[in-house]
Amino acid sequence: MKKIITLVCFFLSAGTVFGQQTVFNILKARALTEAGKPDQAISLLNSAITEAKESSLYTCRAEAKILKGDYSGAIADYNEANKITSFSGEYGLSRIYALKGDAATSLYHLELSMKSFYKKSEKEILLDPAFGTIDNRQEWRQFWKKEWYSVSEKSISEIEYYISIGKVDQSRDVLSEFKKNYDNNSDIIYAESLVNLASGNSSQVMKDVSGLLSTDPGDEKYLRVLAKAQTEASDPAGASTTYSQLITSGVIDAGLFLLRADCYQKTGETEKALNDIGKYLEIYPDNMTALRLAGKVEVKSGDNLKALQYFSENLKLHPNDPECYMDRANSYFISRSWDMAINDYSMSLDLKPENSDAWLNKGISLLNSGKTDDACHDFRISFRMGNKRVTDYLSRNCIK
């Protein structure tokens, strides 16, 4: 059931900006449902709904109810969402009737969704496991014979696909054909920006997307592309501002907090970075990436003791990840706790022996512990792996 019930809480309402508490409640509820705790998610959303009658809260609660097998309750919530914001629950209703095996009713609601602001991409629909129960039906095949997507939508989707699999040249070919038949409208500029971003031309992307945003300042997809381009152009201050626009506009994506935190740590805004990571960890307390980033921010700020706490917590949660050992080893290395560093580098190398930096740092730790022969052994392994930084250590300590 958990595999079939892919979370698709439908967060954005046309013309609606959610308050930050609503955003947090939805993110937390989604995390609980993903973790297989639908009862806790429903309890949280019940309380949230008493404070704010948002369609997104009802669609999220419907997903938690589906995971519990409460299809009737989920249908009621999707219908309630539709009353608050037209068509916001249609895709969810389509999914739930597909799960029930009712192809006709499922496709009725899917058609309503396709004609609305909530229209999903073809790829997203076809990959949605909820429709696996009806995708072999004649009604399903007939449905997809209709032209649901414009040439612009199809071209952009194809460009995104080729970029996602690393075939940038093919994405350029699609863009070229697209431009032959259409004027230089916003879709063309956006599509070209995707190709330019994938090609490393971030300065052109920033110029073009800024132009698009001047006429449509709140467009989520434009803001996301701009933030990526700013990051690629080594402009973390600009990227953090763009991510702030996305967050304050009510976009429901916990990952935005980590992206902004990474920008803040690059600009030296440690408190802001840790605040964003803290928000993310409230939602996903066991997340390896967030705990790692928190530790690295603390290292950069000079609080190595706090960094060790984050890295140790990460290791407790993810004991088979070599990078978690590497993170803590590097922290011990900075504090000159050589024996502890050696132990963690060794554990990391047991899991990932091809890490030349781990061999180098373990060798340095051994050298500082007075174990020159063992250190030289590690230096030679690192050198054979192509690590040029080890050369001085070899020449000074291991060549007699």
Predicted regions and their residues:
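Structural marker of alpha-solenoid helical repeat scaffolds
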Residues: 50-51, 82-84, 116, 181, ...
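Canonical positions in the second alpha-helix
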Residues: 47-48, 80-81, 113, 178, ...
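Position-specific recognition of the canonical hydrophobic site in helix A of tetratricopeptide repeat
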Residues: 33, 66, 98, 163, ...
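Helix-start (N-cap) detector for alpha-helical repeat units in TPR-like alpha-solenoids
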Residues: 22-23, 55-56, 87-90, 121, ...
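Terminal, low-structured helical/coil segments at or just beyond the last alpha-helical repeat
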Residues: 125-161, 368, 372-400
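Canonical tetratricopeptide repeat
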Residues: 60, 92, 126-128, 191, ...
